[in-house]
């Protein structure tokens, strides 16, 4: 097979709850993650040697071994036992970097899916999700995509009903600002640690509460979901760009909910349909420009990384 192209969608967190600290030192999370159609695009081409090379149309992106695309390619090749395999990979970057939208994780997941097909390895999606969990907490979700309950570090997935309406999100981000995810979790522990749960039994009770909430039904405009993001409580007070984005989104009419995604600084408003979303974006055009904020109208997606036909 010569060349394969894969779409790598971003995600938003519709729910992010920090339950406590696990025995391995990671935070125990309870989340609802949703794929959106803001997406990167990766192409994979076979090479005559074992080299793994990555190029990108965004010169600010690191292309070395710290990039999840390269790390995913190396892991897949190692796990499959074919170290002679190589590939030339090109990344068209559309998801903003350091935005809380899992762009890097989605690109890494796309590398697993794309190279699995390019090299004819035959791994199942569950195999690829397991490999993804070794590389990043968001990566198994990015392989699966759609609407998912995510537990543990984020790697334990429970599918939710597919979205049955044409809901849309208006994303807003300051391109000059990024938020360190490790810092956000450290700050969360400092400020909210006294309310953390302790032990697997307590974690499971809280997971069950989330399972029993409205998330078990398809998201509908008539009954908007109860958004929650524990990290927003600690990031917003210390990040003026998040404050500005949430303030502007909260002024819009017709929003179903407004929240920060992940560790930020991207924020979003949920709308009943793409037309309402686009109208809201137009309404805010001058204010967004004055604040130096970028925006995207996005539809919800039912899947994760996908090989293009």
From Swiss-Prot:
Q: Which Pfam families match?
A: GHMP_kinases_C, GHMP_kinases_N
Q: Which Gene3D superfamilies match?
A: 3.30.230.10, GHMP kinase, C-terminal domain
Q: Quick one: which pathway?
A: Isoprenoid biosynthesis; isopentenyl diphosphate biosynthesis via DXP pathway; isopentenyl diphosphate from 1-deoxy-D-xylulose 5-phosphate: step 3/6
What keywords is this UniProt entry annotated with? ATP-binding, Isoprene biosynthesis, Kinase, Nucleotide-binding, Transferase
GO:BP terms for this protein? isopentenyl diphosphate biosynthetic process, methylerythritol 4-phosphate pathway; terpenoid biosynthetic process
**Keyword ATP-binding among UniProt keywords:** yes
Q: What is its EC number?
A: 2.7.1.148
User: What catalytic activity is recorded?
Assistant: 4-CDP-2-C-methyl-D-erythritol + ATP = 4-CDP-2-C-methyl-D-erythritol 2-phosphate + ADP + H(+)
Its EC top class is transferase
Identify which residues the record assigns to the active site: 11, 138
Keyword Transmembrane helix attached:
no
Alphabetized GO MF terms: 4-(cytidine 5'-diphospho)-2-C-methyl-D-erythritol kinase activity; ATP binding
SUPFAM superfamilies tied to this protein: GHMP Kinase, C-terminal domain, Ribosomal protein S5 domain 2-like
Where is ATP bound in this sequence?
A: 96-106
Family matches, as PANTHER family = 4-DIPHOSPHOCYTIDYL-2-C-METHYL-D-ERYTHRITOL KINASE, CHLOROPLASTIC (PTHR43527:SF2)
Cross-referenced NCBIfam families, in alphabetical order?
ispE (TIGR00154)
Biological role? Catalyzes the phosphorylation of the position 2 hydroxy group of 4-diphosphocytidyl-2C-methyl-D-erythritol.
Q: Which family does it belong to?
A: Belongs to the GHMP kinase family. IspE subfamily.
Protein name as it appears in the record:
4-diphosphocytidyl-2-C-methyl-D-erythritol kinase
Q: Which organism is it from?
A: Parasynechococcus marenigrum (strain WH8102)
Q: Taxonomic classification, please?
A: Bacteria, Bacillati, Cyanobacteriota, Cyanophyceae, Synechococcales
